[in-house]
Curated annotation (Swiss-Prot):
Subcellular location, record wording: Cytoplasm
PANTHER family: 28S RRNA (CYTOSINE(4447)-C(5))-METHYLTRANSFERASE-RELATED (PTHR22807:SF30), NOP2 YEAST -RELATED NOL1/NOP2/FMU SUN DOMAIN-CONTAINING (PTHR22807)
Entry EC no(s): 2.1.1.178
GO-annotated molecular function: RNA binding; rRNA (cytosine-C5-)-methyltransferase activity
Active site: 245 (nucleophile)
UniProt-listed HAMAP family: 16SrRNA_methyltr_F
Binding-site residues for S-adenosyl-L-methionine, renumbered to this chain: 123-129, 147, 174, 192
Name of protein: Ribosomal RNA small subunit methyltransferase F
Top-level lineage group: Bacteria
CDD domains registered for this protein in UniProt: AdoMet_MTases
């Protein structure tokens, strides 16, 4: 229980005025004082839901489906010895610990099983929705993941890497720049807007400590700027999903109505009634989902799906771009890199991607990124696959996380003890070496329970650990 949750009286008075007639304040307060149920989302870039459910059964985890996300589950697991974040399944990117209601905006974006070539996630960190989008895109097309706070870009990249995302390009800008810098560039835009966080008290009992009505109105002004910019960045015919983890109508319905008032018949609100069974329990008259915490026993949340019917005039913006530091590899260079990767690790380069070079670094960019090169300065694009040296290429960790599947001939299965040693940054001496696997020298993929966990190098009969230092863990491991 969270009986110490701080909820200002002025906020409760406000909720009383916006709470739907079929809900009551007692249930609202009671829900706010209950801790959230823990939830996870299976990362289908790495494992099917069916296989994950079997794995969960073997581990004694109890899963209950989240109705609005096909690969989302509430989970009951004994974390007294090993927290979920330190399980092998989490560390190898098989699942993401994500609040159930925060899975809803991405489900709304892909409500009709859409296929998008270019998607913008305007406020992406820490990466739960970014990785959810990448999985639904099947790592195809390009996903621009923007984060305004520079301090949060690092964790965004870490989660993208852990989950095997290779079609992302990261940027670090105020989300208000996209409408002017990349007008009508995206098939879909997610704006999970910064907000007053009124829906998060079940996760953070101090979430409302600094709440004031004045701060709500100030944030709403920013949200209106952000949604205008997001709409400008959207192609005609495209879909914008606007979401918050707050309850105030000023930050939700009124922001959407501001967009409609600004752009008129270019804006259509598409009803989310059919998103999942019983969605109508939170449906507004416009077709938005305004979710109070007692309705589905989750965080307070808001989601709107908006269609752009035709072009609107975008602001003219001057921008100064530095020299782009990458050059596209020649056909011969690409073929040589592809051949060496295949020979070394039995990995093929994916189609719809191109090799780019910067000094000795070898990168793989999604082809769909190319129209944006020179239009926006990215902090990171695609994946770094190698560094060139005099004897060939030194393959990088993201080759293992984003390109390997676990079925490669040059991959070795570790025991649980060896896998723990691996995650602690230590070299391993595998007890079981499959017949025909070359040892002694060269690089090798390592896996645990079939899931790739890294890339190492043979030194005689041991594998030199290639795990990046920032990923090394030292205690409470599976």
């Amino acid at each position: 229980m969270h009986p110490n949750v701080y909820i200002p009286d002025a906020f409760l008075e406000k909720i009383q005025t916006i709470l739907p007639a079929n809900l009551n304040m007692e249930d609202f307060i009671s829900a706010c004082q209950r801790p959230l149920r823990k939830s996870i989302r299976v990362n289908t870039l790495k494992m099917s839901v069916e296989d994950f459910v079997k794995r969960a059964e073997d581990k004694g985890w109890t899963l209950s489906p989240v109705p609005w996300c096909d690969n989302g589950f509430w989970i009951e697991a004994d974390e007294s010895v090993v927290p979920l974040g330190n399980t092998a399944e989490h560390m190898s990117g098989l699942f993401y610990i994500q609040e159930a209601s925060s899975m809803m905006p991405v489900s709304a974006l892909f409500m009709n099983d859409e296929s998008y070539d270019a998607v913008l996630d305007t406020a992406a960190a820490p990466g739960s929705k970014t990785t959810q989008i990448a999985a639904l895109m099947k790592n195809e097309g390009v996903l621009v993941a923007n984060e305004y706070a520079a301090s949060r870009v690092k964790v965004l990249h870490a989660n993208i890497e852990r989950c095997g995302v290779r079609n992302a390009a990261l940027s670090n800008f105020d989300g208000r720049v996209f409408g002017g810098w990349l007008p009508e560039q995206f098939d879909a835009v997610l704006l999970d807007a910064p907000c007053s966080g009124e829906g998060t008290v079940r996760k953070d009992e101090d979430a409302m400590k600094n709440w004031t009505q004045a701060s709500v109105l100030e944030i709403a002004d920013t949200q209106k700027d952000l949604i205008e910019s997001a709409f400008h960045a959207l192609k005609p015919g495209g879909v914008l999903v606007y979401s918050t983890c707050t309850l105030s109508t000023e930050e939700n319905q009124q922001v959407c109505h501001h967009l409609k008032e600004t752009f008129g018949d270019a804006v259509e609100f598409e009803s989310l009634d059919g998103l999942f069974e019983n969605a109508n329990a939170a449906l507004t008259e416009e077709g938005f989902l305004h979710i109070f915490p007692q309705v589905y026993d989750c965080e307070g949340f808001f989601v709107a799906r908006i269609r752009k019917h035709h072009s609107v005039e975008a602001p003219q913006v001057k921008k100064r771009m530095g020299k782009f530091p990458f050059v596209k590899a020649s056909k011969k260079e690409s073929e040589e890199i592809s051949k060496q990767l295949h020979n070394a690790l039995d990995i093929e380069l994916p189609s719809e991607s191109t090799v780019w070079l910067r000094d000795k670094d070898v990168w793989l960019f999604p082809d769909a990124l190319e129209p944006m090169i020179g239009e926006l300065r990215f902090s990171r694009m695609g994946i770094k696959i190698a560094e060139a040296h005099k004897n060939g290429y030194r393959w990088q960790h993201q080759v293992a996380t984003a390109l390997a599947t676990g079925a490669e001939s040059n991959a070795i299965e570790l025991t649980i003890e060896e896998a723990r040693e691996w995650y602690m940054g230590r070299d391993v001496r595998p007890q079981i070496i499959p017949e025909g696997l070359k040892t002694g020298k060269g690089e090798v993929l390592v896996k645990y329970q079939g899931a790739i966990i890294g890339l190492g190098k043979w030194v005689s009969n041991r594998i030199k650990n290639g795990l990046p230092r920032e990923l090394v863990r030292d205690k409470n491991l599976f």
